[in-house]
Swiss-Prot record:
The gene is ihfA. This protein is one of the two subunits of integration host factor, a specific DNA-binding protein that functions in genetic recombination as well as in transcriptional and translational control. Coiled coil: none annotated. SUPFAM superfamilies: IHF-like DNA-binding proteins (SSF47729). HAMAP family: IHF_alpha. InterPro entries: Hist_DNA-bd, Histone-like_DNA-bd_CS, IHF-like_DNA-bd_dom_sf, IHF_alpha. It comes from Allorhizobium ampelinum (strain ATCC BAA-846 / DSM 112012 / S4). GO terms for molecular function: DNA binding; structural constituent of chromatin. PANTHER family: DNA-BINDING PROTEIN HU, INTEGRATION HOST FACTOR SUBUNIT ALPHA. This is Integration host factor subunit alpha.
Length: 112
């Protein structure tokens, strides 16, 4: 299910068309929002965008992994990872879109 990748430029263009800011102001706005999200995540804060998703940093403890080639046990050091959790609103929107596409692809049943 490959699709188009939405870039910062695409977001800025959308802001330009829908909000009416200049292209430069739109690009600056997109950059500012992304910077604020990144800065909050780096500070260890949870970023919750209602009806979209939650971003947060989670600590992972040290654990033992296994080299798939040799089967040798390898220690995996503790680290922090960023998680993205889609909201239920976004999940439902994705599901509805998927079901609508699936319904369009279904061939019509001929009358018997």
């Amino acid at each position: 299910m490959a699709g188009k990748t939405v870039t910062r430029a695409d977001l800025a263009e959308s802001v330009f068309r829908k909000v009416g800011l200049s292209r430069t102001e739109s690009a600056e706005l997109v950059e500012t929002v992304i910077d604020e999200i990144c800065n909050a995540i780096v500070r260890g804060e949870m970023v919750k965008l209602s009806s979209f998703a939650t971003f947060q940093v989670r600590a992972k403890n040290e654990r033992i992994g296994r080299n798939p080639k040799t089967g040798e046990e390898v220690p995996i050091s503790p680290r922090k990872v960023m998680t993205f959790k889609a909201s239920n609103v976004l999940k439902q929107r994705i599901l509805r879109s998927h079901l609508a596409r699936k319904a369009k692809q279904k061939p019509a049943n001929p009358a018997a």
